[in-house]
């Protein structure tokens, strides 16, 4: 059977938060009659939120998790941390809004298999879950695969005496694990582990819940980054100030010093040691509830659970062994982000017709920001001209997890500095993702003024830091080569931000 051929102006692959932001930006440049095709391997809009565990909540106040500047219809307090159901409902609302702006055709249950450019057209080969094939011929292609998060499977165990489960397939608040009073071992120390431990502890106070925490994780202190009441005017630490401080101190060689300074100023953690930071948020109330409810915290890494001589034991990476009760529950909370290694693909094709939002060529700190800002460069024909640095986040995490968060912030600040010179002011005004908006307008304006007055002269330091990371860890962290010539910086205007509209 021959493949169906569909033609459109823009094809967007991926209907998660990155894809919806790409669609939002696309809608700013197309007329209502121009056609966009949105396809996703899942059966609905939502990306990883379709598959994630049922008791998940957003890290940050809900209004900043959106497409562009589309407002929520929830009617909740600004500090509300939205649930999975609320997030998916908001995805539906965003899509409803965007359907009114462009001609949108949606293909769910379809996977992109390949793409190729020829004669100014991008040919996208796709296949459906039931085996049908389709070729999309588009003027532009945006691959919003982003982090490509997959559900976690239960950990494979040698023991037959304990239960191995994953939050993706086992809600801690229902079913057999909820009915059992056997001990639980939560494996991991990131956000999933904190959510899981908190769900277990609040559901059945006094139940034995243990944390096998690996190297430990520290979090950004939500109470300090998002203060409430009068403290929004004079308290807390604005995210812009926090990033500015971190990136001024970090030089590509001193990640341990930066982490110590940062934890003292704006960190919170549950474990006695905390070596990892993946931009997660935690409050004092959550931290205290988890810390008080845990029976034990073990700072080691899981290897296996085995039955030996009538006992069940956890085998740990250090060689230590920990005896556990029969019928214990082992919950895999080892994390989702940056675990799957796709082949490297640059963020743009040489023609600028293909934009790829992926972790092997990251340009900003969050996929939401990449989905929003990079299509603006694409549609203004600057995607191949502005010398953004791209970073292989997966490889850096493998080689030096401690340097990862500081490098990501440096990357984001450098590239946003370049975009500030290249894009109209309206692009930044319409970005509802900016958490600086948590604070009253005077504090926002002060932060913006400080950025505009310093970002040109600070850019060389950011470049040196990124170059140092690339050389020190032998990871890809550089601007894209333009043909055979070295990339030249975009000249900076005399002052302020270019305003093209």
Language-model features, listed with the residues they occupy:
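Conserved Walker A/P-loop ATP-binding site and its immediately adjacent core
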Residues: 49
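Rossmann-like dinucleotide-binding core of oxidoreductases
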Residues: 4-7, 11-12, 17-45, 141-262, ...
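N-terminal glycine-rich dinucleotide-binding loop that anchors FAD/FMN and/or NAD(P) in oxidoreductases
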Residues: 52-76, 227-247
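Short secondary-structure boundary/capping segments
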Residues: 53-56, 158-159, 225-229, 344-351
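Feature captures the FAD/FMN-dependent oxidoreductase FAD-binding
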Residues: 77-151, 278-279, 286-315
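Conserved N-terminal/central alpha/beta ligand/cofactor-binding core
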Residues: 65-96, 245-277
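Glycine-enriched catalytic-core subsegment of oxygenase/oxidase enzymes
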Residues: 198, 297-451, 481
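C-terminal catalytic lobe of FAD-dependent flavoproteins
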Residues: 262-340, 436-497
């Amino acid at each position: 059977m021959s493949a169906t051929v569909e033609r459109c102006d823009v094809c967007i692959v991926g209907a998660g938060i990155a894809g919806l932001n790409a669609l939002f930006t696309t809608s700013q440049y197309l007329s209502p009659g121009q056609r966009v095709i949105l396809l996703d391997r899942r059966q609905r809009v939502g990306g990883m939120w379709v598959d994630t565990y049922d008791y998940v909540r957003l890290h940050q106040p809900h209004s900043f998790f959106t497409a562009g500047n589309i407002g929520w219809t929830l009617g909740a307090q600004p500090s509300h941390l939205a649930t999975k159901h609320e997030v998916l409902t908001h995805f539906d609302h965003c899509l409803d809004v965007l359907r009114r702006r462009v001609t949108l055709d949606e293909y769910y249950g379809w996977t992109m298999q390949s793409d190729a450019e020829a004669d100014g057209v991008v040919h996208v080969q796709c296949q459906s879950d039931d085996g049908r094939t389709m070729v999309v011929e588009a003027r532009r292609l945006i691959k919003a695969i982003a982090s490509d998060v997959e559900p976690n499977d239960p950990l494979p165990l040698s023991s037959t005496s304990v239960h191995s489960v994953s939050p993706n397939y086992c809600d801690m608040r229902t079913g057999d694990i909820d009915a059992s009073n056997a001990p639980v071992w939560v494996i991991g120390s990131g956000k999933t582990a904190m959510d899981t431990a908190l769900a277990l502890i609040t559901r059945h106070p006094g139940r034995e819940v243990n944390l096998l925490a690996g190297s430990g994780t520290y979090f950004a202190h939500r109470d300090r980054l998002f203060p409430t009441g009068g403290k929004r005017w004079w308290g807390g630490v604005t995210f812009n100030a926090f990033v500015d401080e971190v990136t001024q101190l970090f030089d590509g060689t001193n990640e341990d010093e930066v982490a110590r300074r940062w934890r003292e100023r704006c960190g919170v953690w549950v474990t006695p040691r905390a070596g990892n930071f993946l931009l997660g948020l935690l409050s004092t109330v959550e931290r205290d509830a988890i810390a008080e409810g845990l029976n034990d915290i073990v700072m080691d890494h899981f290897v296996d659970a085995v039955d030996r001589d009538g006992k069940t034991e956890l085998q740990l990476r250090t060689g230590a062994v920990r005896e556990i009760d029969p019928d214990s529950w082992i919950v895999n909370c080892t994390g989702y982000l940056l675990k799957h290694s796709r082949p490297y693909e640059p963020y743009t094709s040489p023609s600028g017709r293909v934009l790829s939002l992926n972790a092997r060529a990251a340009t900003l700190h969050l996929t939401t920001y990449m989905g929003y800002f990079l299509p603006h460069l694409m549609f203004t024909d600057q995607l191949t001209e502005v010398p953004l640095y791209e970073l292989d986040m997966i490889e850096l995490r493998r080689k030096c997890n401690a340097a990862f968060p500081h490098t990501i912030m440096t990357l984001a600040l450098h590239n946003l500095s370049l975009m500030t010179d290249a894009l109209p002011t309206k692009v930044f005004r319409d970005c509802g993702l900016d958490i600086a908006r948590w604070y009253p307008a005077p504090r926002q304006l002060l932060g913006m003024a400080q950025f505009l007055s310093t970002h040109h002269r600070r850019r060389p330091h950011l470049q040196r830091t990124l170059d140092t990371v690339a050389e020190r860890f032998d990871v890809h962290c550089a601007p894209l080569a333009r043909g055979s010539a070295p990339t030249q910086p975009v000249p900076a205007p005399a002052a302020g931000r270019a305003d093209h509209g």
